[in-house]
């Protein structure tokens, strides 16, 4: 008997269904939400991701604002583009698509974004608000993970969650979300310095793999019946694969596919953040 699939695409469609009337109400009030993107360079993955975001906007009625820049731009040009979107009244929120070319400082670019227009929830000010528990845009992927677990009635309160990966977009903020009183999980954050990773993952009720190492998590590392969230993506000779080995499906209780699990929800909550920013104005 295999695991139950945590269907991110179906869950995304439910979120879009919720967003459409909210966007229509904002539009009727003259406050149409607008999502902006800044894309530097011609990385195929980044281009596809940005195209997907703007296609999502069209589905729910959000205005698209797109700024595509060549890979060899200067820091000054990038800053001018960020400042322009900060000042643009049609842009409710926006993102700087990562990664940036190596000659540009990603942290400096993210810090230059107006925190009130931070659609990704990754501005240092908003991450600080997450620590404090005060209202702010939430990081999209961690928010999507929590929503997916709740959608399938997977108990979070009191659960032991092992998160593999300490990146700023998933691992670190996910631990903050899961330890809020509203979630009340116990979180173990694992990384390259963790000793005996399998011993920890075998204790977990929920495992989140977010490191980008192909098939890192294998069946012998998972407790029978556990929920497994596959976030990381690696490019191999066989195409794109996740962090979770296929044999985990035979043992776990729930597994998110990759692709088709967390990815669609990351994009859905990007739009949700923009709509919520518009509603708060």
UniProtKB/Swiss-Prot annotation:
Gene3D superfamilies, per the entry: Leucine Dehydrogenase, chain A, domain 1, NAD(P)-binding Rossmann-like Domain
Any one cellular-component term (Gene Ontology): cytosol
UniProtKB keywords: Amino-acid biosynthesis, Histidine biosynthesis, Hydrolase, Methionine biosynthesis, Multifunctional enzyme, NADP, One-carbon metabolism, Oxidoreductase, Purine biosynthesis
One GO MF term attached to the UniProt entry: methylenetetrahydrofolate dehydrogenase (NADP+) activity
Reactions this protein catalyses: (6R)-5,10-methylene-5,6,7,8-tetrahydrofolate + NADP(+) = (6R)-5,10-methenyltetrahydrofolate + NADPH; (6R)-5,10-methenyltetrahydrofolate + H2O = (6R)-10-formyltetrahydrofolate + H(+)
Pathway(s) it belongs to: One-carbon metabolism; tetrahydrofolate interconversion
Its EC number(s): 1.5.1.5, 3.5.4.9
Binding site for NADP(+): 165-167, 192, 233
InterPro entries attached to this UniProt entry: Aminoacid_DH-like_N_sf (IPR046346), NAD(P)-bd_dom_sf (IPR036291), THF_DH/CycHdrlase (IPR000672), THF_DH/CycHdrlase_cat_dom (IPR020630), THF_DH/CycHdrlase_NAD-bd_dom (IPR020631)
GO biological process: L-histidine biosynthetic process; methionine biosynthetic process; purine nucleotide biosynthetic process; tetrahydrofolate interconversion
Family from the record: Belongs to the tetrahydrofolate dehydrogenase/cyclohydrolase family.
Function: Catalyzes the oxidation of 5,10-methylenetetrahydrofolate to 5,10-methenyltetrahydrofolate and then the hydrolysis of 5,10-methenyltetrahydrofolate to 10-formyltetrahydrofolate.
Name the UniProt record assigns to this protein: Bifunctional protein FolD
Naturally occurring in which organism (per UniProt): Mycobacterium bovis (strain ATCC BAA-935 / AF2122/97)
Gene: folD
């Amino acid at each position: 008997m295999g695991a139950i699939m945590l269907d991110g695409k179906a869950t995304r469609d439910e979120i879009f269904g919720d967003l459409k009337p909210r966007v229509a109400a904002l539009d009727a009030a003259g406050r149409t939400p607008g999502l902006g993107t800044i894309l530097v360079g011609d990385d195929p993955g980044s281009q596809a991701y940005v195209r997907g975001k703007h296609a999502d906007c069209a589905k729910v009625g959000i205005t698209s604002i797109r700024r595509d820049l060549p890979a060899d731009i200067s820091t000054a040009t990038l800053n001018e583009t960020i400042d322009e979107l900060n000042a643009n009244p049609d842009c409710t929120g926006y993102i700087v698509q990562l990664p940036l070319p190596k000659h540009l400082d990603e942290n400096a670019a993210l810090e230059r974004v107006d925190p009130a227009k931070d659609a990704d929830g990754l501005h240092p000010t908003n991450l600080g608000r997450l620590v404090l528990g005060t209202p702010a845009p939430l990081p999209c992927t961690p928010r999507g993970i929590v929503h997916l677990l709740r959608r399938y009635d997977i108990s979070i309160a009191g659960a032991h969650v092992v998160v593999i990966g300490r990146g700023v977009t998933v691992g670190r903020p996910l631990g903050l979300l899961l330890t809020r009183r509203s979630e009340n999980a116990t979180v173990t954050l694992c990384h390259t310095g963790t000793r005996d990773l399998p011993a920890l993952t075998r204790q977990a009720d929920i495992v989140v793999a977010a490191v980008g190492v192909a098939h890192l998590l294998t069946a012998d590392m998972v407790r029978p019946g556990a929920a497994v969230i596959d976030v990381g993506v690696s490019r191999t000779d066989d195409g794109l694969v996740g962090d979770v080995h296929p044999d985990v499906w035979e043992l776990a209780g729930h597994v998110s596919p990759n692709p088709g699990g967390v990815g669609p929800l990351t994009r859905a909550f990007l739009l949700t953040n923009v709509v919520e920013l518009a509603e708060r104005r």
